[in-house]
Amino acid sequence: MTELNVSKNVALNYLNCATNKLTSLDISKNPALTSLNCNNNTINSINFGDGDALEELRCQSNRLTELNLSKFASLSLLGCAYNQMTTLDVSMTAIGSGKESTPLSCQMESLKTLYLKTGWEIQYITVDRSPSLIHVNTVIEYKD
C-alpha cells in the first residue's frame, strides 16, 4: 500500500498501518486517535493536525527528519528509532512518567540532541546491539 486515506474515520482511535510503502501520513482528521503504529514504511512526514489525544506513537524505520510532539501531553510511549532526525524533544510529553517500562526508543545515528523533561532520570542506555544506536555525541538536555 502506497497511500492511506483515513480522513472520513473521525472516531478512529487506533491505527496500524505498519510495513507498507507509505511516504506520508495524514491523520489531521482523526482527533480521537490515541495509538498509531506506522513502523516500517518510507514516511517522511506525518500531519497530526490539531489532534492531541495521542498516547502511543510507533514510527520506527521511516525517513522522518523531524517530529513535533509539543502538543501531545498524554504521549507515554514513543518508538521513533531508525529515522533521520537530528533533534528530538519529548519534554512536553508524559514519556518518563512511569506508565511504560520502556517508554522511549530513539536509536538513530543522526540524533545529536535529545530533550527530556526535567526530573526524568535515565536508568540505562542500551548500546549492546550496535554502538551507533545512541550516538556517542548525542547531547541529552532537560527542559522544565
Model-derived features with residue positions:
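LRR N-terminal entry segment and analogous cap-like coil->beta motifs
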Residues: 1-4, 9
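Canonical leucine-rich repeat
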Residues: 4, 25-27, 46, 67, ...
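Short, solvent-exposed linear patches
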Residues: 8-13, 29-34, 50-55, 71-76, ...
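N-terminal capping/linker segments that flank leucine-rich repeat
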Residues: 8-10, 29, 92-94, 110-144
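Conserved hydrophobic beta-strand positions in leucine-rich repeat
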Residues: 13-17, 34-38, 55-59, 78-80, ...
